[in-house]
Amino acid sequence: MNGKLSVTRARFFSRLFLTVLLSVCVFAPTVARCADFGPGLPVEIRSGCGDSTKPVVLGVEGKGWLERRAGNLVLHVAGTPYEMGYQHGVLLRPQIQSLVLRLYAAGTAQGLLDPKNQPLAKVQEAYKRCLPYISKDIQEELRGLSDGSSVSLEQIRTTNMIPELFHCSGFALFGRATKGGTLYHGRILDYAMELGYHNFACLIVARPEGKNAFINVGYTGFVGSVTGTNDKQVTFGEMGGGGVGQWDGMPMAFLMRKGLEEAKSLEDGLRIFGDTPRTCEYYYVISDAKIPDARGLATRPDKFLVLKPGEPHPDLPAPVGVLDAVLMSGDQRFQLLAARVIQDYGKFDGPAGLRLMRRPVAMKSCIHAALFAPALGRFWIANAIGSTPASECTYTEYDAKELFEAKSPK
């Protein structure tokens, strides 16, 4: 098959629905790890910074390279869209092939249990309808990823459409809600842990030609973004609503990627998201650490509403009644978030922000948790280990400036 990985084509992804994606913006300072459930326990971190942990280079391809820092994979890609995709594919080929096989196998098994469900067909339909709105750059990067990984282009396209089925929640705190005024933007990604995505976690540092450099907390074989920040200190998060099937627009993960690559300010981010045709129903949190400030967005293909801090929305729970807060969540998790915000209002720092994201705000299926402090040039990432939620695992601290300025070891 022209050297491409042969994977059984079958119904899949019926369980590939994101349970909850929690995006957090907190203005304050430092760190993280979790042990037992609950916000009152101390937090821990380990360093992934070059001054204390020497990165181990695992491979070099063109302008890109793969390294391991504090036990975690960090992929650097640079250049044209095709070059970045090809570097990604070559350097992570075994992992990409393994993940695609795993996803298709899981889908096949689920299809046998529920013959009426055809998630593969739905995802392929989504791609076809989104295709007119997917940039040539993204299409070229997907082609490079396919060539580099030896996975068929159709399979690469299909797996990259998975975020269109995601569902999420989020919030932002800043100004009077925090201590010191430093912007922290965090994310909790709750997902079907049994699919093993957390075993393929990869921090991606991208330097696309003529665009912003950005950091993407992602997974092998994916070029879109659900959690990320750029070198202009603009950070993006999202939560999903309804509207599944409204796919005549740019896929959410590619829109997030567009924001990372192009936005130099909060205003830029709002303009990009407002001007770009969108899919389904999504709520976004965009923050700019330079100001600092944040906005919530309530969007559908035919709607674009900008929510200022503290503003309510009919499809979201009532605000907590505090200033400088954008809360986007639901059900009991929202009530717990609100209680934790009120408890530490005006005192939020890094540890408090990380405690805010602990179980049961994070679900048992939490596969990654992240906290960004762009103005400080630091961020912290935790990935699930086995069946232990990421929110209860050790965080790794990274130096964003060091990563953005890193030079190829070649």
Language model features with spans:
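N-terminal secretory signal peptides that target proteins for export/translocation
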Residues: 1-13
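General helical structural elements
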Residues: 13-15, 19, 161, 191, ...
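Bacterial N-terminal signal peptides
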Residues: 15-29
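Boundary at the C-terminal end of the N-terminal hydrophobic targeting segment
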Residues: 32-34
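C-terminal, well-structured catalytic/ligand-binding subdomain of enzymes
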Residues: 36-146, 177-184, 188-410
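Gly/Pro-rich turn-and-neighbor structural signature
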Residues: 145-187
